[in-house]
Amino acid sequence: MKTAIITDSTASIKEGEIQDVYVLPLQVIINGQDTYRDGKDIDYDRVYQLLKEHPQGLNISTSLPRQADLIELIEAIKDKYDRFVFLPLSKGLSGTYDMIVQAVKPLSTPKKEFVVLETSDIAISLKWLVQEVKALTDTNCPTKAIAEVVDQHKQSIFTAVTVKNLVQLRKGGRISGLKKIIATLLRVKPIIFFDKGVNTLSGKAFTFVQALEKIFTFVKSKFGDNFKIKRIGFCNAFTPVKAKEVKALILDFLHTNKITLQREIESSFITSAIIAHTGIDAFSISLLLDKNK
């Protein structure tokens, strides 16, 4: 059985980067009228520059992938594969999952299986999930077992995003718990926890180190003392120099607090669809945890 995996452009995967993995672009909309496909018609550098030129906020939003792009992709690859596994970003952030389900539901046959799995994920940790599922499909793993692995992954991931301000997040409507504490966040770094597939404004910090302390305090409260970090990801919307400085702070924090890693920190690019909501000078830490160690 040959399997295609289809994810979307928020997964930090470039087209052609992983064999048999295909990327469906979300849409980026500027000024309510100019529409671009994430990673195809517009990229991170262009959106970064636009955000930099509009420090008070840019009228930019995102939308579902075009259904026409989905159908075109399926038509292009349908004869090459027997099974199609879709791993879109969290349905708590986007209607992409529901759109794909409606589009491919009529296509499944005994000879062509179409499977859409809810990931509760985004960005580099969604890429990790794609890599894990790819390894399974390479061994002809049954669909039921793949779905179980996806469910286990959802229970083992956590992402925290620290942003410069809430300008773009407010414009994009991608965050809850905002009204009660917005007035207190004028001069601090808001911290957003992405947990169970949704964003929640969970704290604030004056420094990057303080943000890290809050992040790992939450991880400990959620997962307990007996866990190990299997993978850690660092995504950012900084200049290269600042990105290097913040990554060094993260490493120093982990070392000082005797938090051991099974791998080095993995850095990944942010897509235009994500920076449209975070704004510039934001970073995220994604963790894949082994809770049983």
From Swiss-Prot:
Keywords: Lipid-binding
MF annotations from Gene Ontology: lipid binding
InterPro entries: DegV, DegV_C, DegV_domain_contain
Annotated DegV domain residues: 3-289
Gene3D superfamilies: 3.30.1180.10, 3.40.50.10170
Chain residues that bind hexadecanoate: 62, 94
Tree of life domain: Bacteria
Signal sequence interval, chain numbering: none
Described function: May bind long-chain fatty acids, such as palmitate, and may play a role in lipid transport or fatty acid metabolism.
Entry protein name: DegV domain-containing protein MG326 homolog
Lineage: Bacteria, Bacillati, Mycoplasmatota, Mycoplasmoidales, Mycoplasmoidaceae
